[in-house]
Regions:
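Cytochrome P450
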Residues: 1-409
Length: 409
């Protein structure tokens, strides 16, 4: 008789799921965190403690992330309503509600109003405008002293300039709205500053919409004013879109561009290969969007009803982080997922999400990266990392890009 005990069957129970610290990229790198592969294999739905003290479910497998980001039982909470704070009820403070948090008919109406300006056709026709913004920044950079800081002088202001031009926000106002956007995004930690900054940004967007009504332009805000005036869109949704652009319309692009350029300059021969073989660029952009691990648990969703996954119960009210960057490195989907393959043929990355809240600016993001790289190849063909100068990183953030990038050319 075999007396060897049978292995215990793992029946996970939410009450005993250990809480781990939020995985962070290794210091001085863009990442991704080393824990991703182990979590995908051993604990695809983990519990993590965020730097703000709250806990959340943390999904790292491609198939799970793909389903969760499109699951109607998960919504985007306002950053001023989540995580819950003692003595603070949802909605009792001026919320920073952006396009990402809108649901139902209001969200659908805003998406319809913006479908044309964010379409492939419109973005393609706008690429000369994007290139002019790149050249406007590169002209003084190329003429300047070496080494130069490519992030501070080009990559950081470039998406802001593009966003301002296309949306209809005066670029010269960036000194006003950028610090307030930082404060509004910090509302989770500093409620008073966040509340004041949010109020100021709302007033700024409202006044800008009024100005577009008096002085129409060739931009998205003017288009939304027209939609409001004919009753197809409510004023608050137009304000929400404006807030989206001020606080999120350029930040992720900046990080992707900085990490992408650093990657091409760090992988031997990659920059020169794309410079000399421009036909590879469309596929290379998709590979960089997959490879660059910016989306490290920055998408926070909240369950509106119970969800069962991997034998565990995500309760209504629980926060869920579908980790897009982890999904994009899933070895069950991508061959050599941790390698950069500029000719990768099959690349179903999830960087832009999917479902009702997939990134409406995905075509614009691709165009920005394409124009950014083309401009660098044309203007700085011998671009290289400066010797004895290392990029500076903000190592406490789950989403990282170099704050500085010293280069020679």
């Amino acid at each position: 008789v075999n007396t060897t005990p049978e292995p215990a069957v793992d029946v996970p129970d939410v009450s005993v799921v250990p809480v781990i610290e939020l995985p962070l990229p290794p210091p001085g790198t863009m990442g991704p965190p080393k824990e991703y592969q182990r979590l995908r294999q051993e604990c695809p739905l983990a519990r993590v403690r965020l730097p703000i003290g709250a806990t959340a479910w943390y999904a790292t497998r491609y198939d799970d992330v793909k389903e969760l980001v499109a699951d109607a039982r998960l919504i985007r909470p306002s950053i001023t309503d989540w995580p819950p704070r003692p003595g603070h009820a949802p909605g009792d403070e001026p919320g920073l509600v952006t396009m990402m948090e809108l649901e139902g008919p209001r969200h659908a109406a805003l998406r319809r109003a913006l479908s044309e300006p964010f379409s492939v056709r419109s973005v393609r026709s706008g690429m000369p405008r994007i290139r002019r913004s790149a050249d406007r920044l590169l002209d003084p950079f190329v003429a300047g002293d070496q080494p130069g800081d490519l992030v501070v002088r080009f990559i950081e202001p470039f998406p802001v300039m593009v966003m301002c031009d296309l949306v209809g926000i005066p670029y010269e106002d960036s000194d006003y709205f950028l610090p307030r956007a930082d404060a509004a995004l910090g509302a989770i930690l500093t409620l008073e500053e966040g509340r004041e900054a949010t109020s100021q940004l709302r007033e700024y967007i409202t006044s800008l919409l009024d100005r577009k009504r008096r002085e129409p332009g060739d931009d998205m805000l003017t288009r939304l004013v027209g939609e409001c005036d004919r009753g197809a869109l409510d004023h608050e949704s137009a304000v929400n879109f404006g807030l989206s652009m001020l606080v999120a319309g350029y930040r992720t692009s900046t990080m992707f561009l900085a990490d992408a350029v650093l990657t091409l300059l760090s992988v031997p021969g990659a920059y020169a290969r794309l410079r000399d073989h421009r036909a590879l660029l469309p596929g290379a952009v998709e590979e960089l969007l997959r490879y660059v691990p910016v989306m490290n648990g920055v998408v926070v969703l909240q369950a509106v009803e119970d969800i069962e996954l991997h034998g565990r119960t995500i309760r209504a009210g629980d926060a869920v982080l579908p980790v897009l960057a982890a999904a994009n490195r899933d070895e069950s989907v991508f061959t050599d997922p941790d390698g950069l393959d500029l000719c990768r043929a099959d690349n179903p990355h999830l960087t832009f999400g999917r479902g009702a809240h997939n990134c409406i600016g995905s075509h614009l993001a691709r165009a920005q990266m394409t124009v950014c790289l083309e401009a660098l190849f044309d203007r700085l063909p011998d671009l290289r990392l400066a010797e004895d100068h290392r990029p500076i990183w903000e190592d406490e953030s789950p989403s990282k890009s170099p704050l500085t990038l010293p280069v020679n050319w």
